[in-house]
């Protein structure tokens, strides 16, 4: 009997727990062997009793198999070749639980199976796992793997490492086994990070000499792809010294001719990276993003930082993304834990997950596919806490505390080790710290490795040619530290004193941007470049405006 006057009353009920309960019920059916209507069999003979509807809901492969006019449509048992039972078990469990465990041991086999069986979400998760663990040791193999399985993000990011760190890549054992086609692909990249002819000729000679009988004729083609000037004297010397090539004088002369007169060679400098200037300070916080190509000396402006009232933040880049972490507001000195992420490909900002600890005047670096935030200030005192953001897990995780909390220090990464140099210590920066702290992520441990000859704060550090270079600060002194030899040496002094400047490695040189000159009492707009071969600094351009405390990173666009 209808309630009087309520005939049009409708209540739309939705049980939010129903999807979970539904999945749990099918998981129970699977575990108990209830209502199953299809059996999957591995090459090892292990079988899994499943439900067609569940498999079809997760896999386009099984959906097509069970709905199209195929013989498997009517079979009760499907034999799957080439898939290990552990991998198939993981995919079947995923179908019933929405969860799967991905490890370094199983990720490639799991991606291959997910690609074959079209478990698209699992394939994407495996791809992101591999991107997270990319490095110079595996980027060549991962690039080929990504091409074969059509993993666009993995292909792009492995190519980014391959091109941006080519000098390190070609010294890996994996490089000697690459195919001619892969080598030609590498050499044909317009953004390949090579700036000197020996930097590209040496890997060509090394690769050829590794299998001289089968590769000697390939060298004609390889040399023709080198898009920089080739000195015939150098080429002749390099080929002649590589005795394993067993080249006659006539063949060397022929190689030189072909290298200097190729069909498709365009002799030009390669722009290997683009500089990004993020925010900064000029009497007040700056919110602009400026982008510079050093070859054309052209500046363009990107999307502004959404949170434009902060200063003294940390900036680092991971792939195409630039992370801005922490800082403090101009109207107070309360440390911030907020994070903003700038995507250089889309020219857009998104807010990231907040850090575990608020901090300002801290160091930010990238290591092993993660973003690290180290030390800094909080409530006027230097903080020892350090943490990292794992983009795959989408969370910040703590690491061991620093030996000494420092603010306004500098940090960089060399050979998978983080170095934190100098900075302020003591309440409100009452002391300058003279030690270099290093962090080994494999054992989650900090060490004191050396003392700086000139303790400083507000300076920058960059890794270059297996050494650390320290620039900026209150003096023009430039120092170079060799971790392997544990030795310091001074190089040519800079042209300006640059407190809280920016510094990056681009095109085989060190670029230092902006800063504040205490001797002149002015903010600086100029850009200095250091050529390590000449041991010389020169002014090469200007920032769009004078500034200090800005982010300065380079992104290899692919």
Swiss-Prot record:
Keyword Amino-acid biosynthesis: no
Limits of the BTB domain: 36-104
Database matches in InterPro entries: BACK, BTB-kelch_protein, BTB/POZ_dom, BTB_POZ_KLHL23, Kelch-typ_b-propeller, Kelch_1, KLHL23_BACK, SKP1/BTB/POZ_sf
Residues annotated as domain BACK: 139-240
Kelch repeat spans: 274-320, 321-369, 370-416, 418-466, 467-508, 510-557
One Pfam family per UniProt: Kelch_1
Lineage: superkingdom: Eukaryota
SMART domains named among the record's database cross-references: BACK, BTB, Kelch
Keywords associated with the record: Kelch repeat, Repeat
Protein name (record): Kelch-like protein 23
Organism this protein belongs to: Mus musculus
Classification of source organism: Eukaryota, Metazoa, Chordata, Craniata, Vertebrata
Gene label: Klhl23
């Amino acid at each position: 009997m209808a309630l009087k006057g309520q005939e049009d009353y409708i209540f739309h009920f939705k049980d939010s727990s129903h999807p979970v309960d539904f999945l749990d019920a099918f998981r129970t059916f699977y575990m108990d062997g209830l209502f199953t209507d299809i059996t999957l069999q591995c090459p090892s003979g292990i079988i899994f009793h499943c439900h067609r509807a569940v498999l079809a809901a997760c896999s386009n492969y099984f959906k097509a198999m069970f709905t199209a006019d195929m013989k498997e449509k009517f079979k009760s048992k499907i034999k799957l070749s080439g898939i290990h039972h552990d991998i198939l078990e993981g995919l079947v469990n995923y179908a019933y639980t929405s969860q799967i465990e991905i490890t370094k041991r199983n990720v490639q086999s799991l991606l291959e199976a997910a690609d074959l069986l079209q478990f698209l979400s699992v394939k994407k998760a495996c791809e992101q796992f591999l991107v997270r663990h990319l490095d110079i040791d595996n980027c060549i193999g991962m690039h080929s793997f990504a091409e074969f399985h059509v993993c666009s993000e993995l292909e792009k990011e492995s190519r980014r490492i391959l091109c941006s760190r080519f000098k390190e890549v070609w010294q890996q054992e994996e490089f000697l086994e690459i195919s001619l086609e892969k080598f030609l692909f590498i050499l044909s990249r317009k953004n390949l990070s090579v700036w000197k002819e020996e930097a590209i000729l040496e890997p060509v000679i090394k690769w050829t000499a590794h299998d001289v009988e089968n590769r000697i004729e390939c060298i004609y083609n390889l040399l023709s792809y080198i898009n920089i000037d080739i000195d015939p004297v150098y080429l002749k010397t390099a080929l002649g010294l590589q005795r394993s090539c067993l080249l006659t004088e006539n063949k060397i002369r022929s190689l030189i001719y072909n290298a200097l007169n190729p069909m498709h060679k365009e002799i030009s400098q390669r722009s290997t990276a683009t500089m990004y200037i993020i925010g900064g300070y000029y009497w007040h916080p700056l919110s602009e993003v400026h982008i510079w190509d050093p070859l054309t000396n052209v500046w363009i402006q990107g999307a502004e930082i959404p949170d434009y009232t902060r200063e003294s933040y940390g900036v680092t880049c991971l792939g195409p993304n630039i992370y801005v972490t922490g800082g403090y507001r101009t109207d107070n000195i309360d440390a911030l834990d907020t994070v903003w992420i700038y995507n250089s490909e889309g020219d857009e900002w998104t807010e990231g997950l907040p850090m575990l600890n608020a901090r300002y005047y801290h160091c930010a670096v990238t290591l092993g596919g993660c973003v690290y935030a180290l030390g800094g200030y909080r409530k006027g005192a230097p903080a020892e806490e350090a943490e990292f953001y794992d983009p795959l897990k989408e969370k910040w995780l703590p690491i061991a505390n620093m030996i000494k909390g420092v603010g306004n220090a500098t940090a960089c990464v060399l050979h998978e080790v983080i170095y934190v140099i100098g900075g302020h210590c003591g309440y409100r920066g009452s002391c300058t710290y003279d030690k270099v702290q290093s962090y080994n992520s494999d054992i989650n441990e900090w060490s004191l490795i050396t003392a700086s000859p000139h303790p400083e704060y507000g300076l920058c550090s960059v890794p270059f040619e297996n050494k650390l270079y320290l620039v900026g600060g209150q003096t023009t002194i430039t120092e170079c530290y060799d971790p392997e030899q544990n030795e310091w040496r001074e190089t040519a002094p800079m042209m300006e004193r640059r407190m809280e400047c920016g510094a990056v490695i681009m095109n085989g040189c060190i670029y230092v941007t902006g800063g504040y000159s205490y001797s002149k009492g002015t903010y600086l707009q100029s850009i200095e470049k250091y050529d390590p071969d000449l041991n010389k600094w020169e002014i090469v351009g200007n920032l769009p405006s004078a500034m200090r405390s800005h982010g300065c990173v380079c992104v290899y666009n692919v």
